[in-house]
């Protein structure tokens, strides 16, 4: 069966009792945002700078007080905080971790959280107080981030994505059951200049046991990444025993979110480029011909970040082709977004024919910086929410005004095997002055039907309980 980042109740798994995590700035890639629906190319418009481009809020959104138990305050949580969520939901600080990144539930029902800055994997076990007891499971790793549990040869294994390799650990009796096996080694985590842009990695496991992971670009928009050895800006796959290591999808600038859909397909959430030049010969803002110009009003809203299916041989086009929600498309639509030539790296389509590339299934507002992604089917999250995926949006740096951090929700269309544009499920992580007090990194459903959200800015794990 496909991998899930929430517990699977199998005959071999104990019954799970009901229970009441940018510190790593290099990992965010694109971290700016904007309105994906304004500034149609070629119309000479100069869109207003605002946050109106954020996905619409979920129906009946309400301001919900974030409950901070005694001893769990401090830092960003010294001030009372309010989250925007569907009416009837509740929110509580479940644990404090200074560098909380990706999450994965153990077969026994405990939550693993990665702390890349400290090289650790932490285990959070529910306690009687409604919070969690925190212990160290692994340490001394190289910036570990993504994690995935899967069945192998009749037992459980834990995959961990370090920046330079993918590890497999046997899991037994509620913990690491033996020595690690490196199944993909010497992965690129620095560019030739020694920079560490987009070095963080995620990992997921398909139904057939194939292990998928991302290798981000070393730059914002340097074509050399496509010819480096090993390649950058790709999604790779490997068998559990470390054989058949291969590139599956190219042109993926920073596909740091990976997840398996209900139909078994693999999907990635991608941080797209910053400072995009205007793509067409047309008036825009104060320019009579804006082609190739880097214009703040345009950059604010372009290009959209991507949620795309991982398909063998597919190319998302980076850095030659950019998703453009305005080109030959209903302005502002973020479904089936076409790819168009970048005026700096691919003028006139001389380096790559973007029209031959499949459109991006779903766009997110520009510079959202999506990170962890999880499909909720099969979880205990109630109602309509189980019929979609959640994506943790880390928020922007390259936009006036910044795109706010959030947890977005995308409905899964089972008939078409795709997703629909996002709505904001959880918001409210920004201060009145537009700065961020919190930045979600991951969101996973727990065995109790709650949603557990990691936040590496506030250093916390939130337990969000849906109504009903």
Which functions belong to the PLM regions below?
Residues 78-80, 84-96, 127-140, 171-193, ...:
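Blade-edge beta-strand/turn elements of extracellular beta-propeller
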Residues 54-84, 218-220, 238-241, 253, ...:
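Beta-propeller domain segments
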Residues 444-468:
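Blade-level signature of beta-propeller repeat domains, shared across WD40, Kelch, NHL, RCC1
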Residues 18-21:
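C-terminal motif of bacterial Sec signal peptides marking the signal peptidase cleavage site
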